[in-house]
Curated annotation (Swiss-Prot):
Keywords: Acyltransferase, Lipid A biosynthesis, Lipid biosynthesis, Lipid metabolism, Repeat, Transferase. Residues 349-360 have a biased composition (Basic and acidic residues). GO terms for biological process: lipid A biosynthetic process. Coiled coil: none annotated. Disulfide bonds: none annotated. This is UDP-3-O-acylglucosamine N-acyltransferase. The keyword Ribosomal protein does not apply.
């Protein structure tokens, strides 16, 4: 359940108020004044908690829940125990999230809470930097020459904003992050330890590996979120661009000259080599690696732990190493399994194969 020590909730709400906020229907009006103080999963919830159900995998948890109320679709309404108030919703999880955002609005941004609003005494801000009203700079952060920061933005403790960087309004730059050669839009959220604008991995790979100057920038458009430890290299000649609304998980590496479209989703530990292009609404599972100069079309999806060496047409689903259309990938895996079973590859080792005998 939600931790009230780290995320103090708003005052409690009645089920009538929750129904109005989530656009759900309270099935039994006699519960209208029952108050909810927090959120919890079905198995942890108590009488003052709201939970939700939309997956039959959790039927046992629903049958045994002690929750005060449950958001559920009309299809599963009859499964809710009689002591639990029913809030009927077309999309229960969406409704649950709507109330969670209302109840725990502080959890939506990566605040560290180590500094008070305003400029910390130990922050270092160059005299030529321009900060709009209501900017917060936490302890030990460093703001370099000619930096511009928009109102409502928070610069986390120990962050370094190098010369000439421009940051828009209502951003959160996580503690220990480092930004250089970058232009950042409005409402951009960076979790701790992001590194933006360092030089790309550009060399002439021969002899002593001659370094190629990286003279481009990183441009991050509005409403982007970057997970902890994510790194984005600046371009060599053209810019590295992250499109509006894109959400990037922890520990993702994005190489120089990469262009990522709008509203993409990139899960943890992906590695994107230089000069590739992702269209709009592309989804990459965790630990996907993509070769340089590849183009991934709008709406394409790549399964976790795939290796992509070829361009992917718009709207297609690929997976595997090397990645190919998922139907082809599944057929190949099934064929290999049948081949292995038919060849007796899973038979026991020969009795005289005692190479590891006695090994501790």
């Amino acid at each position: 359940m939600a931790s009230t020590s780290f995320f103090p909730p708003r005052p409690s709400s009645t089920l009538a108020e929750i129904a109005s906020l989530t656009k759900a229907t309270l099935v039994d009006a006699s519960y209208a004044e029952h108050r909810i103080t927090g959120l919890a999963s079905l198995d942890e919830a108590g009488p003052m908690h709201l939970s939700f159900f939309e997956n039959l995998r959790y039927s046992d948890e629903l049958a045994n829940t002690r929750a005060g109320a449950c958001l559920v679709s009309e299809r599963f309404e009859g499964r809710v125990p009689s002591h639990v108030a029913v809030l009927r919703a077309r999309r229960p999880f969406h409704a649950f999230v709507a109330y969670a955002r209302h109840l725990y609005s502080d959890a939506l941004r990566p605040h560290t809470g180590v500094g008070a609003p305003g400029i910390a005494p130990t922050a270092v801000i160059h005299e030529t930097a321009k900060l709009e009203d209501e900017v917060t700079v936490e302890p030990l952060a460093v703001i370099g020459p000619d930096v511009e920061i928009g109102s409502g933005t928070v610069i986390g403790a120990g962050a370094v904003i190098a010369a000439g960087v421009k940051i828009g309004r209502d951003c959160d730059i996580g503690a220990g992050s480092h930004l250089q050669h970058a232009l950042i839009g409005n409402n951009v959220l960076m979790h701790p330890g992001c590194h933006i604008g360092q030089d790309g991995f550009g060399f002439i790979f021969a002899g002593q590996h001659t370094k190629v100057p990286q003279t481009g920038r990183v441009i991050i458009q509005h409403d982007v979120e970057l997970g902890a430890g994510t790194t984005i290299d600046r371009g060599s000649l053209r810019d590295t661009v992250i499109g509006e609304g894109t959400k990037i998980d922890n520990q993702v590496q994005i190489g120089h000259n990469v262009t990522i479209g709008r509203h993409c989703v990139i899960a943890a530990k992906c590695g994107l080599a230089g000069s590739l292009t992702l269209g709009d609404n592309v989804a990459l599972g965790a630990m996907v690696g993509i070769n340089n100069h590849v183009v991934i079309g709008d709406g394409a999806q790549v399964a976790a732990m795939s290796g992509v060496k070829d361009s992917i047409p718009a709207g297609e689903r690929w997976g595997g190493i090397f990645a190919r259309p998922t139907r082809t990938w599944f057929r190949e895996m099934l064929a290999v399994r049948r081949l292995a079973e038919g060849s007796g590859a899973e038979t026991a080792a020969r009795p005289d194969d005692d190479r590891d005998e006695g090994r501790g």
